[in-house]
């Protein structure tokens, strides 16, 4: 029978509940347990798909096509299991389900209320999500509740967790509370009062934390932990210090060294083998001891909040681990390029344009792509980054000078990128959309397999088939592909049914490494395995760096 660990947060948000939950899951998995994770989001949106990245951060896409919270990306990077749609749900989904049941008459005329109807629905969603992977036989389900204790939005979720802990047998439920212990410079000490108040608020709801994770910028001394224990009524050995580190991949070892996994196993009466965190130790060692260093220019429009590109940033770091390279990322606002030109792109080892939506900043991205193409700088375009690479090539090489996307110009004379109105989803069902369709869940979403053209760079990277996750509405327009191909562009993969371009590249005679993909490869990269595309990209950056250095040395001699 599955046992549950609820992870809550207090004092402030963004303390790292997702990292804490994923790290605990990684330790338990290393002990031979089957672990799954759930994210319970208190916002009323049905999913984060229509939310601005500047508000919410990245939207992580699961294999089965769900638009979910970015924490699910952390989950997949820390454990071996792949998350599903039911591993993330929101207040919006809960109310949508309850209201649908009420309309169908399932409540038999009763007054529908937060307690018991909403809280019971939350519990049903939790139990369903816990069965989503491992053939429904997970040993432990770690459930992260979004927001902080005291938020009105989180109360139904906390109440549902409290009810669930009462309903389940003894030793089947534990609570982990992550809280802030701030350091006050003027006083020269860590302050425990916010943690005390946060735990007090949790106890008022009826929840007693099993473990306290105390977040600070430095390790909390023993006397500080003892004080927190005394005033919070949590055993001292269960007060765990979590401090700032240079990489999140150090967190599993940090928690294990303080015995957190033993505490949880005892509380849940789990019989597990000793933890083996050697894979994490190796990753941390590789990150700390690189043999090379490159600088990648990431040209986007959400760069002021790097959480917007969380999986992409991590994928580049994973590639660095697997190529023994320190990867520095220079975040460049594409609107700055529109105002000030491309001088900021000089001295970069490679350029990457990530996915995005809307017209703002696109001409700056196109200018960056042109710079990369004309100066032989390795280029990787992802989703919109591929579409813009096609537009740039069409305008400046294929003599389609008015080339554009109907996303930016619905009346474009040369729509080399356009809205596709009908396609088959990953299950083979026909999906349709138009300009008047709702924005939510009207994209090509989830994994899709495609054959890869032999003899291409794509084939060298992926082999005969690619299976990656998608999130986009617009596609390269097949009407213009013959003209683009006559000008040298290579379409190296197409969807098997609609034959829509999935990957594009330039031949080595035109550019040493110029590559675009319609999908999002960052969603399948993990620190343990890396990802072949990002490893190839970093290798291309290293090769470009060597050529530049050789050229400079040659010029110096002459």
From Swiss-Prot:
Amidoligase domain: annotated span: 1-270
Binding site for ATP: 14-19, 71
Active site per database record: 383 (nucleophile), 520, 522
Binding site for L-glutamine: 356, 384-387, 407, 473
Enzymatic reactions: UTP + L-glutamine + ATP + H2O = CTP + L-glutamate + ADP + phosphate + 2 H(+); L-glutamine + H2O = L-glutamate + NH4(+); UTP + NH4(+) + ATP = CTP + ADP + phosphate + 2 H(+)
EC number(s) stated in the UniProt entry for this protein: 6.3.4.2
Any one cellular-component term (Gene Ontology): cytosol
CDD domains per UniProt: CTPS_N, GATase1_CTP_Synthase
SUPFAM superfamilies: Class I glutamine amidotransferase-like, P-loop containing nucleoside triphosphate hydrolases
Keyword Cytoplasm in annotation: no
Pfam families to which the protein is assigned, alphabetical: CTP_synth_N (PF06418), GATase (PF00117)
Known pathway: Pyrimidine metabolism; CTP biosynthesis via de novo pathway; CTP from UDP: step 2/2
GO MF assignments: ATP binding; CTP synthase activity; glutaminase activity; identical protein binding; metal ion binding
InterPro entries: Class_I_gatase-like, CTP_synthase, CTP_synthase_N, GATASE, GATase1_CTP_Synthase, P-loop_NTPase
List of residues binding UTP: 13, 191-196, 227
Biological process according to GO: 'de novo' CTP biosynthetic process; pyrimidine nucleobase biosynthetic process
Top-level EC class as recorded in UniProt: ligase
Family: Belongs to the CTP synthase family.
Function according to Swiss-Prot or TrEMBL: Catalyzes the ATP-dependent amination of UTP to CTP with either L-glutamine or ammonia as the source of nitrogen. Regulates intracellular CTP levels through interactions with the four ribonucleotide triphosphates.
Subunit structure: Homotetramer.
Miscellaneous information on this protein: CTPSs have evolved a hybrid strategy for distinguishing between UTP and CTP. The overlapping regions of the product feedback inhibitory and substrate sites recognize a common feature in both compounds, the triphosphate moiety. To differentiate isosteric substrate and product pyrimidine rings, an additional pocket far from the expected kinase/ligase catalytic site, specifically recognizes the cytosine and ribose portions of the product inhibitor.
NCBIfam families hit by this protein: PRK05380.1, PyrG
Protein name as it appears in the record: CTP synthase
Biological source species: Polynucleobacter necessarius subsp. necessarius (strain STIR1)
Gene this protein is translated from: pyrG
């Amino acid at each position: 029978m599955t046992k549950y660990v609820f992870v809550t947060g207090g004092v402030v948000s963004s303390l790292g509940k997702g990292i804490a939950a994923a790290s605990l899951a990684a330790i338990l998995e290393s002990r031979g347990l089957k672990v799954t994770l759930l994210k319970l989001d208190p916002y009323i949106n049905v999913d984060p798909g229509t939310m601005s990245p500047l508000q919410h951060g990245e939207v992580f896409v699961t294999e089965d096509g769900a638009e979910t919270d970015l924490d699910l990306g952390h989950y997949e990077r820390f454990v071996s299991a792949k998350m599903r749609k039911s591993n993330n749900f929101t207040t919006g989904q809960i109310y949508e389900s309850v209201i649908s049941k009420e309309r169908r008459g399932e409540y038999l005329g009763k007054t529908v209320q937060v307690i018991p109807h909403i809280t019971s629905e939350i519990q049903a969603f939790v139990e369903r999500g816990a069965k989503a992977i491992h053939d429904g036989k997970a040993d432990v389900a770690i459930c992260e509740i979004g927001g902080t204790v005291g938020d009105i939005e989180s109360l139904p979720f906390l109440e549902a967790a409290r009810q669930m802990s009462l309903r389940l047998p003894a030793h089947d439920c534990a609570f982990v509370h992550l809280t802030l212990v701030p350091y006050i410079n003027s006083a020269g000490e860590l302050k425990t009062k916010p943690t005390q108040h946060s735990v007090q608020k949790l106890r008022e709801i009826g929840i007693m934390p099993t473990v306290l994770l105390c977040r600070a910028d430095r390790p909390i001394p023993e006397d500080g932990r003892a004080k927190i224990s005394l005033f919070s009524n949590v055993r001292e050995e269960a007060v765990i210090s979590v401090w700032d580190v240079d990489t999140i991949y150090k967190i599993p070892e940090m928690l294990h060294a303080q015995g957190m996994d033993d505490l949880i196993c005892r509380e849940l009466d789990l019989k597990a083998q000793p933890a083996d965190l050697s894979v994490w130790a190796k990753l941390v060692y590789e990150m700390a001891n690189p043999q090379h260093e490159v600088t990648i220019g990431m040209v986007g429009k959400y760069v002021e909040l790097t959480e917007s590109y969380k999986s992409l940033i991590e994928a580049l770091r994973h590639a660095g681990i697997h190529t023994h390279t320190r990867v520095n990322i220079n975040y460049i606002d594409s609107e700055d390029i529109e105002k000030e030109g491309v001088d900021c792109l000089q001295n970069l080892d490679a350029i990457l344009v990530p996915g995005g939506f809307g017209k703002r900043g696109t001409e700056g991205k196109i200018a960056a792509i042109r710079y990369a193409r004309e100066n032989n700088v390795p280029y990787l375009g992802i989703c919109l980054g591929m579409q813009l690479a096609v537009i740039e090539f069409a305008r400046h090489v294929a003599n389609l000078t008015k080339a554009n996307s109907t996303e930016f110009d619905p009346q474009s004379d040369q729509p080399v990128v356009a809205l596709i109105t009908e396609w088959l989803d990953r299950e083979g069902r026909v999906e349709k959309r138009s300009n008047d369709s709702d924005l939510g869940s009207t994209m090509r979403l989830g994994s899709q397999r495609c054959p890869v053209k032999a003899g291409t760079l794509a084939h060298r990277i992926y082999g005969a088939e690619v299976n990656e996750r998608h999130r986009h509405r617009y596609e390269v327009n097949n009407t213009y592909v013959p003209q683009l191909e006559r000008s040298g562009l290579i379409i190296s993969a197409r969807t098997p049914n609609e034959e829509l371009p999935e990957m594009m590249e330039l031949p080595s005679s035109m550019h040493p490494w110029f590559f675009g993909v319609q999908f999002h490869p960052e969603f399948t990269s993990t620190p343990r395995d890396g990802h072949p595309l990002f490893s190839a990209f970093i290798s291309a950056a290293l090769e470009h760096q060597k050529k530049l250095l050789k050229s400079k040395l040659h010029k110096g001699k002459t």
